[in-house]
């Protein structure tokens, strides 16, 4: 039987739209070179002779230049390049036969596969062809996306019920489109029970484009109950999105569900939408919500009530509601979003000195997924240990944060704080073991704290050698890998940088050995993409590899002319790494520009204060100029804050006003009676809290990269004050 799916396929993204969204492959983009234009360096600073460690790294990188030369020096056939560009152009049109013919004419296998991958990633091609490509090419990226694209195509093209069922081969679909396609097949074969199950799952749990909803409801609406509609509405609004555009998009989708709800739920839904969108009439609409006829709590409504209470400073009412909410996912719809709301309320409680209430909000982590669970366990343990002075209560939480850690940063944090709890219980041998394990993670804030804890607070040398040297066989496999070759071809053909970024992003997790990943990082740097090289290095470190040489590059930082006594170079490198990963072309959503993310108004103030010409376009094109402006700003803020690195970094990330506000609310981390480690953990804005820790950790590694003796002096940095240095 043939299933006519045209009615349902109106929401499937077209090939031109997909290409535009995914890679921005306009004609101008295709012609544009992938690497940024070189930037100017305006002044020289004398450099000391390289140390033995630096010389060893130089030799290592020179050797890798030789080893990867066969792929780095690859010169694509100009005819192939033109066919590739033309195929990409036609893929964004209705001439798919022409695009396929051009792809088939490309002689270089890697270039031809690149053209196929771009088409399949955009959802152009038969569903089975897309799936076969994914299964046959594990070294190629965006695999989950391509599976979803295949399901989009299956829905768009339809076919026999046998063909559709064979496509899934008994597995559950991955997308709303896939569930709809499979539900259609079962419905056509007369299996209404399975069609109802699949359609219900699509509606309750998956994204469905607006243009797709009408056809879906026409076909499956009779299978959906008001409970299903309520569940879809809850899934959309049990959410803590900080982006106004994200909230608007979700609310627009939710609003289309409102007419499908029961009469009583429609009134509640209007109030919930108003709260979610932070509308002025939210309180008035909330006051009109009728009590539930069955006396049961509507936990979707309760979530919006908690949001409204917190935003209108009804703190204790919000804490009570959030603390007493069940942990059953069936009731809460999304426990992780409830956790985010609980965490926000917890920082409000800490700010107000209500430590018991804060602990009650975070004490139970039932039902959370891995990331929220490890953060919940840490917060509960830290509050119990440091604020409630109850190490017995703290220890099981901190042990849970240690054992649930899924990456090096959370691992180091869990080990370090478990050690602190064991110390407080005078279980010193066990505490040392925890510090030892944390200290192995050398490029983490808590790992560095653990190292200094073990040394009695003394400053320490950090010696870091280059990665493992690849064997001849590893080199052969690397330079012949088609996705590696495709990245070079994409770069030299002038394709959009995001194509290369996607290839490297997948390969950095796919390649197996330290030497493999080092070659990948080296290749990215050799192609002029320091940011991608750095990200490859970060992933390598997270996988337990020594990729410090690439994850913490030194050479991209420019020589510059300081306007005042500058911050130490390690600090500037640390900030640049955190702000832009040395990609000087970045402009933030707030308008910050260039290497160190300078706001135009900041540049104008610095130019006025130091009586120099202000040239805002140079913030993006001249790294030396950007460093001159930003170093003066950083130096000025730190001087105002009496040399405090902690407060200086808060001011740079969140603004000087926030630094002064948090001194008033949380105490002064420069004073002896305030523990700066605890002070950082009480910063209520997650981005700033993590920024301070990461930049301070970066500083320690960069001192080592700059061959400074006693590079690890984090404890001194935490307590730094100009009047007591």
Task: Cite the ranges covered by each PLM segment.
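Residue-level recognition of tetratricopeptide repeat
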Residues: 88, 152, 184, 234, ...
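Structural motif corresponding to the intra-repeat A-B loop/turn of tetratricopeptide repeats
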Residues: 93, 157-158, 189, 239, ...
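Alpha-helical adaptor scaffolds
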Residues: 119-121, 135, 147-155, 340-354, ...
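Solenoid-like repeat scaffolds
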Residues: 69-77, 100-110, 120-124, 132-142, ...
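Catalytic glycan-binding domains that act on GlcNAc-containing polysaccharides
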Residues: 117-119, 131, 136, 314-317, ...
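TPR repeat positional signature
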Residues: 83, 111, 116, 147-150, ...
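Compositionally biased, proline/threonine/alanine/serine-rich low-complexity intrinsically disordered stretches
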Residues: 30-80, 724
């Amino acid at each position: 039987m043939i299933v006519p799916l045209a009615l349902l396929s109106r929401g499937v993204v077209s090939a031109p739209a997909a290409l535009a969204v995914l890679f921005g492959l306009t004609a101008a983009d295709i012609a544009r070179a992938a690497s940024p234009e070189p930037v100017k360096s305006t002044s020289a600073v004398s450099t000391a002779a390289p140390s033995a460690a630096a010389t060893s790294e130089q030799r290592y990188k020179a050797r890798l230049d030789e080893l990867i030369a066969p792929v780095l020096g690859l010169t694509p056939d100009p005819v192939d390049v033109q066919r590739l560009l033309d195929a990409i152009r036609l893929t964004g049109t209705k001439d798919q036969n022409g695009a396929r013919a051009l792809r088939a004419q490309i002689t270089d296998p890697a270039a031809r596969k690149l053209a196929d991958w771009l088409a399949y990633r955009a959802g152009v091609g038969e569903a089975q062809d897309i799936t076969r490509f994914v299964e046959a090419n594990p070294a190629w990226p965006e695999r989950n996306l391509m599976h979803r694209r295949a399901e989009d195509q299956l829905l768009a093209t339809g076919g026999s019920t046998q063909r559709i069922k064979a496509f899934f081969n008994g597995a559950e679909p991955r997308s709303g489109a896939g569930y709809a396609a499979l539900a259609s097949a079962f419905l056509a074969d007369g299996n209404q029970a399975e069609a109802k199950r699949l359609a219900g799952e699509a509606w309750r749990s998956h994204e469905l484009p607006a243009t797709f909803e009408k056809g879906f409801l026409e076909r499956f609406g009779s299978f959906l109950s008001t409970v299903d509609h309520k569940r879809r509405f809850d899934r959309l609004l049990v959410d803590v999105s900080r982006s106004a555009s994200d909230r608007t998009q979700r609310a627009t989708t939710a609003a289309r569900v409102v007419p499908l709800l029961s009469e009583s739920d429609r009134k509640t839904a209007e109030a919930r939408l108003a709260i979610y969108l932070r509308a002025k009439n939210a309180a008035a609409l909330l006051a009109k919500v009728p009590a539930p006829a069955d006396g049961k709590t509507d936990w979707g409504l309760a979530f919006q009530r908690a949001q409204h209470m917190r935003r209108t400073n009804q703190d204790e009412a919000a804490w009570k509601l959030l603390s007493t909410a069940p942990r059953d996912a069936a009731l809460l719809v999304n426990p992780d979003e409830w956790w985010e709301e609980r965490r926000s309320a917890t920082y409000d409680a800490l700010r107000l000195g209500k430590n018991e209430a804060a602990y009650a909000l975070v004490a139970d982590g039932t039902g959370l997924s891995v990331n929220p669970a490890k953060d919940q366990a840490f917060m509960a343990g830290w509050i119990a240990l440091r604020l409630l002075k109850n190490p017995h209560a703290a220890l099981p939480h901190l042990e849970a944060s240690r054992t649930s850690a899924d990456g090096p940063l959370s691992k180091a944090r869990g080990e370090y704080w478990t050690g602190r709890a064991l110390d407080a219980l005078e279980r010193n041998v066990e505490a040392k073991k925890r510090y030892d394990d944390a200290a192995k993670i050398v490029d983490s804030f808590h790992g560095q704290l653990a190292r200094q804890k073990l040394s009695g607070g003394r400053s320490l040398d950090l010696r870091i050698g280059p990665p493992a040297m690849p064997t001849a066989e590893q080199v052969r496999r690397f330079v012949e890998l088609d996705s590696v070759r495709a990245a070079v071809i994409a770069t030299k053909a002038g394709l959009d940088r995001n194509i290369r970024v996607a290839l490297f992003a997948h390969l950095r997790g796919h390649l197996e050995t330290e030497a493999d990943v080092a070659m990948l990082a080296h290749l990215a740097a050799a192609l002029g993409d320091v940011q991608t090289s750095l990200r490859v290095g970060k992933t390598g470190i997270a996988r337990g590899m020594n990729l410090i040489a690439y994850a913490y590059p030194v050479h991209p930082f420019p020589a510059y002319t300081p306007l005042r006594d500058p911050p130490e170079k390690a600090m500037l490198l640390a900030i640049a790494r955190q702000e832009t990963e040395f990609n000087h072309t970045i402009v933030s959503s707030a308008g910050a520009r260039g290497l160190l993310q300078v706001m135009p108004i900041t540049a104008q103030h610095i130019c006025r204060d130091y009586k120099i010409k202000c040239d805002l376009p140079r913030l993006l094109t001249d790294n030396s100029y950007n460093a001159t402006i930003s170093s003066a700003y950083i130096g000025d803020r730190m001087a105002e804050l009496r040399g405090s690195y902690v407060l200086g970094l808060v001011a740079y990330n969140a603004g000087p006003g926030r630094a002064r506000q948090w001194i008033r609310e949380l105490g002064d981390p420069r004073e002896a009676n305030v523990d700066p480690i605890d002070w950082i953990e009480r910063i209520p804005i997650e981005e700033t809290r993590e920024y301070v820790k990461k930049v301070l950790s970066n500083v320690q590694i960069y001192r080592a990269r700059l061959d400074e003796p006693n590079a690890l002096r984090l404890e001194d940095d935490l307590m730094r004050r100009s009047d007591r240095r």
